[in-house]
Amino acid sequence: MSDYKKTLSMPNTNFEMKANLSVKETKIQENWVLEKIEKKILAKNKSNTPFIIADGPPYANGDLHTGHALNKILKDIILRFKASVGFYTKYIPGWDTHGLPIEQEMAKRGLNKNANQTITEKRKNCKNFAIENVYKQRDQFRRLGILSEMDEIYVTCDLDYVIRQIKIFNKMLSKGLIYQDLKPVYWSWSSQTALADAEIIYQDVESDSIYVSLEILDKNEFVSKGDKVIIWTTTPWTLPSNLAIAANPKVTYCRVQVENSVYVISKNLVEKLAETLEWTNYEILSEFSGKKLENLPYKSPISDKKCKIIVDGYVSDSDGTGLVHNAPGFGHEDYLACKKYNIKPYCPIDNLGKFTGEVNDKELAGLFYKDANPIIIERLAKKKLLLKASKFTHSAAHDWRTKKPVIYRATKQWFVNIDKISKEIVAALNKVKSIDNTIIKKIKEMVLNRQEWCISRQRIWGVPICIIYDKDYNPILDPKLLNNIVDILNDEGINAWYNEDAKYFLTDSYNTSKKYIKETDIMDVWFDSGTSYSVLQADKLGYPADLYFEGKDQFRGWFNSSLITSVAAFKKSPYKELLTHGFVLDENGNKMSKSLGNIIDPLQVCKEYGADVLRLWVASVDFSKDVSISKDIIAQNAELYRRIRNTLFRFILGNLNGFNLKKLRGAKYSEADLYVLSCLSNDIKTIKACYDKYDFKQIVKIVSKNVADLSSWYFDYIKDPLYCEKEDNEQRIAIQATLYQLLDSYLRILAPIIPHTCEEAYEFFDKKDKQKSVHLEGFTNFKIDSKYKVDFKKWEEFFDLKDKVYSEIEKTRNEKVINSKGQAHITIHSKSLPFDEQTLERYLGVAKVEFKVKEKDGTTIKVKNSKYARCERCWNYYPTNLIANELCERCKKVIGNKKI
């Protein structure tokens, strides 16, 4: 038997089967930088419409996690696609570099503990650490295959950025949208600073629950002297600061006789309280509105001071007693209610959560607030004021960084007045679009639920609030002075604020012999990142940005702060479109944690599988929800990647070897070729629409299905003409032209998702007008010529028939009747066939197709061994009389007089 292998046109390409991405990707990335691919793309699209994604800055602390990878890769896919269709897509990544975590890291390292250190020296240590982490994370992001070279970045501690931020602060100040006030704010004793809503998390805690009776000291026509109001509280430690009791003016209250005492409570809660306080025998004496209690005096439970009952609509009669203990120094609603009665906040708790001497109680002074609870409860019991004490579990506010409980505490802070611009915020949001309508609704609710935003922090590592006070601690809001401060800081650096005396910043109009004091607080880090749109303004990239795209936690964070500052300063939303993604969880829906051992390190995935496999996972998930990742899930995506690489790219590259590009135009396509090209044309239209609406998972589904479909039929069918026909055979040339269009299109389709592999395959692709990079090609514009008409119904019938035939062939093979489908003789009983028998023989890859008309509906298929002889060159089966000297007629002609 002769060896005919040398006479076949077998696939040949240097595009390797083994990806070896961990090595190849870094080289490809180096080449992108060397060839300035990003800059060439930007130059190519410079005069076109911009599409700008504003980068929400990750925090410059630690290594990247899968959440970072998900976010950056999603943005990169969008930008690569937008660039491929002609948009100008300059991208400036940024980092959030201020804040408590870095101060805490310095404390861990012992760098900022020296009592002799200046604030400037401490800030320098913080900055060095932050910048070190910026560069580390930048290199890690580059490993993910981000198109941006990241040579132009923004960092929130850079002087230019800080100056722009202070100018925005001053602009809001000049509009009366920033003010200072003494009022309760979330206070973290563990971090020793005020916190904003976005910095609060909720965790279950066990608290004291007490019911306390307080004696009324006077009478009116509805209440008698000596009657007792009942209050319920879960914060006994605030009772020394009690300054009022609040009733609802519209709620009905009653006097209830219980043994020798008369209590005043909400009528609606009598039965509930009777059960809670175990009143076995009680009588309602009278009823009246809460308004009738206003200004009645009572004795405060711990201080014994004479206080008064006030009325306010916030008081509820759905739980408690319908009467609320008010400590305006420790509660926001208390503060607002008491303010109407000119009752000022009283707050005898220090930064560490300990009672100060102001409490005027030797036993409590210096005590941590929680430790005061048992002492206060014991005192109430001794005074016979305690009606009931118990424990209960509830959700309470905690510091998001330290995970310790926080309290409301009245301190002098700086606030943004959100309520004042609420209408402008709504108007701005109404112009913002989103693929998910609930996103706009959610951000609107999040912002409008806040009347104010506390933006001052009692720390050192941040942007200083550059305000100077007079000797009486009144802030001087003179625009000329504020501008002078900005000019000095711009010239000398931000640390001049800490190095110089307050008088150094004064203009000539001020009397320097007087006393002036500098503000020591810094701005909330959300104000830092929330003014990052200034980067776009400074770079003239277009403001508002086309897209803000971050995790769903940013409704309370970056989306929120950016919107507030932008509307306040510039009367517009900073984004035209808003998009969110979910959190990354393990395959069981659990959060990543070291204790569970379920952490997937994105950099380790890049090392083990390659960034393109990680990127394929990102593209395959429904990012609008929480997404799952695990070793098994990554392995599944690696298998899909392998099919794309080898079944699609490598197979086609191998079979385009020697293809004459000049033959593209005159190719004479078969019905099969035209069907494949028509499907490609339709899919390109669908895929482009998916890219436009960020539906990457659907793109992956389409590509995955097409790879499976092509490999299961078309690629199998075309092997015979590709391998066995002469190189100039018309059918073979048409098939190669079809493969050319498939490869050219899929390289461009998949370039945003698996950019390294598409770049590698493109290197081996001999194509017309070849560029330096596949990413300079632009998105595929292939569209099948309208002169070609494809009967898709006929093809549906064919594929339905194919599945039935192959199913019967498999049964016959299992029964050992045939060894391969090439031996099969197929008899089809049906009303009609989609193609004639000879065409079906080629398309199905069988020896013989015999058609027998069947009057009734349905198709019956029978398979038997054709008993034909095999051609030893092409391995097709023919009647014995058509095989001579091992070869079929076609193969004899192809070989001709060649010596084997």
UniProtKB/Swiss-Prot annotation:
Q: Which cofactor does it need?
A: Zn(2+)
What does the Swiss-Prot or TrEMBL cofactor note state? Binds 1 zinc ion per subunit.
Identify which top EC class this enzyme belongs to. ligase
Gene Ontology molecular functions? aminoacyl-tRNA deacylase activity; ATP binding; isoleucine-tRNA ligase activity; tRNA binding; zinc ion binding
Tell me where it resides: Cytoplasm
- Keywords on record: Aminoacyl-tRNA synthetase, ATP-binding, Cytoplasm, Ligase, Metal-binding, Nucleotide-binding, Protein biosynthesis, Zinc
The record's InterPro entries line, in alphabetical order, gives: aa-tRNA-synth_Ia, Anticodon_Ile_BEm, Ile-tRNA-ligase, Ile-tRNA-ligase_type1, Ile-tRNA_ligase, M/V/L/I-tRNA-synth_anticd-bd, Rossmann-like_a/b/a_fold, tRNAsynth_Ia_anticodon-bd
Name the domain of life. Bacteria
Binding residues for Zn(2+): 871, 874, 888, 891
User: What GO terms fall under cellular component here?
Assistant: cytosol
> Is the keyword Nucleotide-binding in the record?
yes
Coiled-coil regions, chain positions: none
Question: Which residue ranges does the UniProt annotation give for the motif 'HIGH' region?
Answer: 58-68
Assembly and interaction partners:
Monomer.
Task: Please give the family membership noted in the entry.
Answer: Belongs to the class-I aminoacyl-tRNA synthetase family. IleS type 1 subfamily.
Q: What is this protein called?
A: Isoleucine--tRNA ligase
Gene name, please? Answer: ileS
